[in-house]
Amino acid sequence: MMVDNEEINSLSIENILERINKSSNINEAKSLCLFASSLFDNNQYLLIQRYLISIKERDFDISIQLFWRLFNNNSFKEYIVLVVLKFLEKEIEDLEYYDFIKKNYRDQFQKIFIDSDDNSTNNSSSSSNENKKNKRSYLKLNTILNKLTKSLNHLSFYISEIDNLNKFFNPITFLLNNNNNNNNNNNNNNNNNNNKNNSNNNNKNNNNNNDDSNNNNNNNFLKILELIQKSCQYLNENENYEYSILLYLLIKGKFENKIRTFIKSSKKEDQDIKSKIKRFWFNGIQSLNQYKNKYSSKIEIEPPLPMKSYFDEDDYDQKQQQQQQQQQQQQEQKGSKEDEEDIEKQKKSLTSEIELFLLPINRFCLPIIFHIENEEFEQLDIKGNSGSGSDSSSSISKLEIVDQCWKYYICKGDDITDESILEIQKFLQQFADSGKHLKRHQNNSILNFTINLLSNPEKARNDYFDRNSEGNGGDENDENSQESNDSYEFEIHLGIYLLSSLLYISSWRYFKFLVTGSSNIEKQNIQTIGTLKKNQILLFDANFNSNSNSSSGSNGIINNNSNSNQQSYHNNNNNNNNNNNNNNNNNNNNNNNNNNNNNNNNNNNNNNNQGQQPNLSMITHQVLYYSNVDDESSFDDEFPKIVFTKQQTEAIKHLTLCMECFNDLNQEPWINDFKRILSTTWNNSKFYWLYNSLADSHYYYKLDGANTLIPIGDSKKRLFNPNDELWFNRLLLNIGMTNHSEIEDSIICLLEILISISIPPPPSSSSSSFSSSNSSLNNDLFNQQLVPSKHTFKTIKPYLTVFSEEEILFWCIDTLATCYERLGMVGEITVLYQAYWNYYKSRFYQIINEIKGTPNQNPNLIPLSNLVKKDLQIGYFFPRFFDYIINIEMLEEFCFILNKGFKLDILQRNQTVSSNREMIDIIKRHITITTSNNNLTIPILLKQFFNEELDHFLIKKENREKQYSSSNTANNSGVNNSPIHNQNTDVEMNE
């Protein structure tokens, strides 16, 4: 049907549109629309009608041209936003950041993406069809779409028609796909151009076609960036920043390669595109900060918990007093005290805040940030806050963004894989390369700084200090002074990122060795699961057999039933070799090999049924015990006799690097930045392994004193689960071994461990009654002793030993005995010596010789402490002797001493004897009673002893703290100026 132009001229625009819509012929409708467009230029209805017709005709190239006309027409501003958001709605479930929050942070997801007004609607009953249709109706995005649709009610007919054709054509999808196809075609054409068989003319034609295609492709790319920016501008005006950043992240991900190519380009013809990409990026940064400012206030974040740090040891007591006073005032005002669950919740919120906002910054800013100059930030002056009432003076710097990008990598505490390390390595390498122009040096190896965190992390640290130990290599003058300052600032930031990353990785690799027996990190060979009823940590390693039955327990589990852990260090290697042999056999097709496979599988099943688990390791360090050795003593150190396996040697390398980086970071110019990292980013229980490695590095390198009390929050037990205390016990054990300055605190730590773990019964034998003959004394009581560690060496140096509950028990008792010895508590030492009698026998006889005044005959024995010697010169004093001493050989020796005329003060205050013979009779009666009592065993006595000792030291500590607190209160109130008050205080203290 032909279009009558004269008739059309006489019709109004409404009539023309009605006629177009009623037309059943697409060609007629198109002709009417084209002719009417010449009469009514830029009419919005005719424009969108033409757009609709082009889609129906499947002429998508024309559709894109018309879509850009719609985009440039201000009347379609909201419609364009609607199109973009509908595309986002379709893609949203596949977006990394959206999925990350949805899966990991439900509470934050509700606050950010869920429309509270729609919650009731979403929760109400509705038909299944409606639920399928509106599966995301609870999102704020749905509210935004509804609002836009209502504002576009005058275009509802066209929007509905276009939506019905969406399966054939979506402008955003078409542009993205077309861009990728053009890139692939250009690459293919470039490959063809390199073919020697192509003629020169063909090459010219192809080059021309490539240029045209590239220009068109680049124009569409820039238009897409502009399209997204305008859509995000609309969202930001309505404070919907969360969807702005999703759009920015989506487009940045789609054009990652193109953006990287242009941002790195130095070609003159690419500079215009490069500047527009930067404008897009800066607008994205602005949206990210607006998003963070909005939702960080809605997500309740408490300040980090107070921590005792290595750095401020001198003024720590003063700060602690101030904090205690402030806490007391707050408690009086509130009338209640926050419990540990609330504090843990606050710390979790802090961690959530870190990951919630660092992830999008990291994904959006890298690697673009490395190609942005500081001056560009200063010129654009991007603000950290926006909106009414905001602080417009706070601007964002380049290094601030770089810092946030880096922190994302080191805030993930519970799973460090090869992929994680390579991401950190890539970041550090890109950052180092971005500062090449600031470094002036004649040595290219210094300029081309190469970082390899997996295979040679020590070299990265050494190379960093080498490149900064030598001069700039250039002449110093005023012109270069600014460059020198910029270079210095850059190197400082590179240092904090590199050294902290090395500390982070080396700590994990050392910890991995402790748990799995190997510090190697290979692809997908380690997973961490931090959730059982006891919050146990499971580390699965490729080196260990993963085919065990569920009934035999999981490999690598840290548990309190550690009998299976008492194996040699070489068992794992043997098991690995067996498994490798089995795998090799499985690859053969011979019948004999199949038979071998069956045998091997049977062997594996037998091993699994035995519940074998990988060895755990720990460091032992007998500093207190060997501090009795002076320079003049003859002492044969057995440390050279200890043979470290390859895996142990590798683990010590990581521990050494951990210590070196820690020492580096505790110096200027990094100490303040490192404090902030420890007090915020790493101030969380999931970084227990990092503090574990830091503690071990201190123990290994003999950093004795109060600074071995690592910063683990205001209450040490909050960092570990008290229901599964094995790791916590091991930490306290090492503190007890090395803490010279607070012996009584170490004793409390050790006693808490000993109460929490089980003491196994000693080897049993047939019970026998006591008779007066000495030969009959060799009975059950004599045999009641525990099995000591098989890894005891006479050395002052630390070394690795098996980590098991039995090993913890031995070293706790051993360390407790040395703590008692340093306090001169000889009787308490004697009680502990019964637990491992054969091991401590020689030391017990040193005490006996000291009582008798007999000099030590063996110069290689560790001498008793000076305080023990001084007390024994007065006499052996232990009023609880008959409550806890049941070892027959000990009792015989004390009878022998009494026969020699030496005095023992071992009776209660209300008991007296007239002669040593009477005391001997009491001891013999004691032997008779104890041997006839089957319930009187070493484990029972030790448990009773540990509880009694802990109560004693806790009461003593409480009284000491009360006295300290009352003294501080008096000093702060000024009462201490009164002579009367001072006099009364002295009387109280003397009492």
Swiss-Prot record:
It is found in: Nucleus. GO terms for cellular component: nucleus. Residues 473-484 have a biased composition (Acidic residues). Keywords: Nucleus. Residues 319-333, 549-609 have a biased composition (Low complexity). Its main location: nucleus. Residues 180-217, 310-345, 462-484, 549-614, 961-991 are annotated as: Disordered. InterPro entries: Integrator_complex_assoc (IPR053129). Residues 964-991 have a biased composition (Polar residues). May be a component of the Integrator complex, a complex involved in the small nuclear RNAs (snRNA) U1 and U2 transcription and in their 3'-box-dependent processing. This is Integrator complex subunit 10-like protein. It comes from Dictyostelium discoideum (Social amoeba).
